[in-house]
């Protein structure tokens, strides 16, 4: 994101300016609005650890609008979400695809939401390997293990039987917010903040 708006607040000492994401962090809001990669994962993990250190008893709100991305980077975020003492509430705005959908489902049960026009998409992990036949075989076996791990976690998070998850993730599987709620990826649809 190249343009980041600034917020100016009045304090008893004068004016104070923040970039918008720092201001949202003060309200315990983290935003993923890009692909999941090492850089975005490092930022999100650091923000979650910071918010836990600030107050381990207050929820973190994690807004997701992501096409997905790296499985390893996504697992870094997922594991941190499970590790911190704070409940992490997830909210999909726009699209949560691939690893974005996985992270949406990883929120605290009962606190996973989507806005009404959100789209959610799950599928199996993508991969590619080059090199000697033995190396390609090693990579193929690894991606199959990764697929099985992702499917098992999605089954646990959604309550869907593992064989249904395996069938549905064989190809791109798109859902509306209503369908994602019925599937168990989210718990409710947010129309207006209360």
Swiss-Prot record:
EC top class named in words: hydrolase
UniProt keyword list: Cytoplasm, Hydrolase, Protease, Serine protease
Catalytic reactions of this protein: Hydrolysis of proteins to small peptides in the presence of ATP and magnesium. alpha-casein is the usual test substrate. In the absence of ATP, only oligopeptides shorter than five residues are hydrolyzed (such as succinyl-Leu-Tyr-|-NHMec, and Leu-Tyr-Leu-|-Tyr-Trp, in which cleavage of the -Tyr-|-Leu- and -Tyr-|-Trp bonds also occurs)
InterPro entries found in the cross-reference section: ClpP, ClpP/crotonase-like_dom_sf, ClpP/TepA, ClpP_His_AS, ClpP_Ser_AS
Main location (coarse class): cytoplasm
UniProt GO MF annotations: ATP-dependent peptidase activity; ATPase binding; serine-type endopeptidase activity
Cellular location(s): Cytoplasm
Record: active site: 98, 123
EC number: 3.4.21.92
Subunit annotation: Fourteen ClpP subunits assemble into 2 heptameric rings which stack back to back to give a disk-like structure with a central cavity, resembling the structure of eukaryotic proteasomes.
Protein name in the entry: ATP-dependent Clp protease proteolytic subunit
Organism encoding this protein: Ruminiclostridium cellulolyticum (strain ATCC 35319 / DSM 5812 / JCM 6584 / H10) (Clostridium cellulolyticum)
Gene responsible for this protein: clpP
């Amino acid at each position: 994101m190249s343009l980041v708006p600034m917020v100016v607040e009045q304090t008893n000492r004068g004016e104070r300016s923040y970039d918008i994401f720092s201001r949202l962090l003060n309200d315990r809001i983290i935003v993923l609005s890009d692909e999941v990669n090492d850089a975005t994962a490092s930022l999100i993990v650091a923000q979650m650890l910071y918010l836990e250190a600030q107050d381990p008893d207050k929820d973190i709100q994690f807004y997701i609008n992501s096409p997905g991305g790296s499985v390893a980077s996504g697992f870094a975020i997922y594991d941190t979400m499970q590790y911190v003492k704070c409940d992490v509430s997830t909210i999909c705005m726009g699209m949560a695809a691939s690893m974005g959908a996985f992270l949406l489902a990883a929120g605290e049960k009962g606190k996973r939401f989507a806005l009404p026009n959100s789209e959610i998409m799950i599928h199996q992990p993508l991969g590619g390997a080059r090199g000697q036949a033995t190396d390609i075989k090693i990579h193929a076996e690894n991606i199959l293990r990764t697929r099985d791990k992702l499917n098992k976690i999605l089954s646990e998070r959604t309550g869907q039987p593992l064989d249904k998850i395996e069938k549905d993730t064989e190809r791109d599987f798109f859902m509306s917010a209503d369908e994602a709620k019925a599937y168990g990826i989210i718990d409710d649809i947010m129309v207006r903040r209360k």
